């Protein structure tokens, strides 16, 4: 089963390509508080909400209702790294291994026993993920990871996240494929 919150084009195409037909998907609609929408108009991104923890708790309900034993996600090893110099602080705690442990303990002690929440990609780096992903050409034209362009189902090709994904994939993919994905050579873009 594939759990999907507020599906977009890339989500639907990725699930389909991965073998999760519509009958193997569970859809949930998430709405935002009006104040959050006002902040969006001011330029703030939704990434400032603890989205991964929302996913964890809502996926727990879906797993329970569908008699699933595991909730599997895709947070890589770097989700544990500190994002504040000389501090043990990550700005996305809900993507960390510590959160996985805390969540599992909380669920077991306060809600139910028998469902495990974990990240399959936890042991590997973003570099290793990029190397593996580069072998999956069927996903090239459909995957998206740009926060700014996500509402329009595209890469904006102007933000740090687009540049990061471009850089991390570039050792493993040819330039033509990279340009087909992003629309241009981001390494040649002086504004980035």
What does each of the following model-derived ranges do?
Residues 1-192:
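Nucleotide-activated chemistry modules centered on ATP-dependent adenylation/adenylyltransferase
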């Amino acid at each position: 089963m594939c759990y999907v919150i507020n599906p977009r084009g890339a989500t639907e195409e990725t699930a389909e390509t991965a073998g999760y037909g519509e009958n193997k998907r569970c859809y949930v609609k998430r709405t935002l508080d009006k104040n959050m929408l006002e902040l969006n108009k001011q330029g703030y991104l939704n990434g400032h909400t603890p989205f991964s923890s929302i996913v964890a708790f809502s996926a727990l309900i879906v797993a329970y209702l569908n008699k699933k034993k595991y909730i599997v996600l895709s947070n890589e090893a770097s989700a544990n790294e500190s994002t504040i110099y000389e501090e043990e602080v990550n700005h996305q705690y809900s993507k960390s291994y510590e959160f996985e442990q805390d969540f599992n303990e909380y669920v077991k002690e306060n809600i139910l026993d028998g469902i495990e929440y974990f990240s399959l990609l936890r042991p590997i780096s973003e570099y290793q993920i990029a190397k593996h992903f580069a072998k999956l050409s069927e996903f090239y034209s459909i995957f998206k990871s740009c926060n700014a362009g996500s509402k329009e189902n595209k890469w904006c090709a102007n933000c740090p996240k687009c540049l990061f994904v471009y850089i991390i994939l570039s050792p493993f993919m040819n330039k033509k494929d990279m340009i087909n994905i992003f629309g241009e050579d981001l390494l040649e873009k002086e504004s980035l």
